[in-house]
Regions:
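Pyridoxal 5′-phosphate
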Residues: 1-424
Length: 424
């Protein structure tokens, strides 16, 4: 692991050489890692290695290649369980409680469609925050509609903080499920998911955590968080696209029906009926992206062992602080969210006064600066914030960025202002 003090030296960059796209395209300042991360060479090599040395369908063959592929999927499942603290009292990974999906969205849909009908009835309440990504909102809208339940929202204060008072006011005897992102993909703020979980558990309810923006940046422990379910995607954590994770408490997963049916998720099938395989196989119908799962293991090893969460946190905090200070010196830039840069975990949302975010992003692209512009799949939040055009710009930084990337962003923003307003 890299020493955190070394990692925090943002005028140096020991990481870009590990990322082929960044190393091969020095003209790019990639500041959109909240949408998807770049992949280190070891991840690309791992996917190729799978196809070259063990390409076979896991779980479906008794020959050596298939057995090897099956073993590797199991190994990565254990690796994920350890990563998120899903271990028993003796520290052994509870791998059977790790379900591989396509992405965070599918993981959250699986909980909403398969778990909520087992506990939700007319008159109950599901609690979410106004900061949720659409993937952690729309499934609960549909679940409430199907059950006759009510969707209740937790709102932050003016700094984006959900207070104890708000939690106490919104979570009550009718609350059966609460779903919240650990880190907002727009504001970058970390939500008090532990407090929310404690409140919902006190009412006999269940806590669903969207870890898409937290797992890539910080250590996550499902027990410490009080999670009953946790969802995240590999592609935001240096892994391949198309691989998601759902962890759930075993008793809850065991009681849930599958969302998809088909090959290898069954125990037995007759002409008129079928029974299901145990967890996790019953939620993994059909052939999975075995090479992607294998490469995900390599990605998580690079993130947690080669770099280390302590170094990730130190470097990203230094980068955000530097970017927040430099962008704050531009009087035409409107920063969004908490005034303390330390509350923005890798994410800075902003607008350029009088310029549509899409125009900002297009002009930045001409300078090789890659950011996101739009509603960020969080329209209710932007509506609540009163953001003009229901859109904003977002620069999201990762440990493989450096001071030069931020300087290029600031220079390009100055160019945006010049294009639209001249040099006054």
């Amino acid at each position: 692991m890299l020493d955190a003090k070394v990692a925090a030296k943002i005028d140096e960059n020991p990481f870009k050489q590990d990322f082929p796209l960044l190393a091969g395209h020095p003209e790019l300042a990639f500041l959109d890692s909240a949408a998807t991360a770049q992949r280190p060479a070891c991840v690309l090599d791992a996917e190729r290695r799978f196809y070259e040395t063990m390409n076979a369908n896991p779980l479906r063959g008794l020959y050596s290649l298939s057995v090897a592929a099956t073993a590797e999927i199991g190994r990565v499942r254990e690796q994920v369980a350890r990563l998120i603290g899903a271990v028993d009292e003796d520290g052994r990974p509870l791998a059977q409680d790790v379900v591989f999906t396509r992405n965070t969205s599918e993981s959250l849909n699986l909980v909403a469609k398969s778990f909520s009908p087992t506990v939700l009835k007319a008159g109950d309440e599901v609690c979410v925050t106004i900061m949720e990504h659409h993937s952690d909102l729309i499934p609960w809208q549909q679940a409430c509609r199907a059950a006759g339940a009510t969707l209740v929202f937790l709102y932050p204060n003016e700094d984006g903080v959900i207070t104890d008072k708000e939690i106490a006011a919104k979570i009550g005897p009718k609350t059966r499920i609460c779903a919240a992102a650990e880190v907002s993909n727009v504001l970058g703020i970390r939500l008090p998911v532990e407090k929310i979980a404690a409140a919902v558990h006190a009412q006999g309810g269940y806590m669903v955590i969207d870890g898409a923006q937290s797992v890539p940046h910080m250590a996550v422990d499902v027990r410490a968080l009080g999670a009953d379910f946790l969802a995240f995607s590999a592609h935001k954590a240096l892994g391949p696209m198309g691989i998601g994770v759902l962890w759930g408490r075993h008793d809850l997963l065991d009681a849930m029906p599958p969302m998809l049916t088909g090959g290898e998720m069954i125990d037995s099938v007759t002409e008129q009926d079928a029974t299901w395989a145990p967890v996790p196989e019953k939620f993994e119908a059909g052939t999975q992206d075995a090479a992607g799962i294998y490469a995900t293991g390599e990605a998580l090893a690079y993130l947690t062992q080669t770099v280390g969460y302590e170094a990730v946190a130190a470097r990203e905090a230094a980068l955000v602080a530097y970017a927040w200070e430099r962008m704050g010196q531009l009087d035409f830039v409107e920063l969004i969210g908490h005034p303390d840069a330390s509350q923005h975990h890798g994410v800075i949302s902003f607008n350029v006064r009088g310029v549509h975010p899409h125009d900002v992003a297009s002009i930045l692209d001409m300078s090789g600066v890659c950011i996101r512009a739009g509603h960020h799949c969080a329209q209710p939040l932007l509506t609540w914030l009163g953001v003009e055009n229901l859109a904003c710009c977002r620069a999201s930084l990762a440990f493989y960025n450096d001071q030069n990337d931020v300087d290029r962003l600031v220079d390009a923003l100055t160019q945006v202002w010049t294009v639209f307003h001249g040099r006054d």
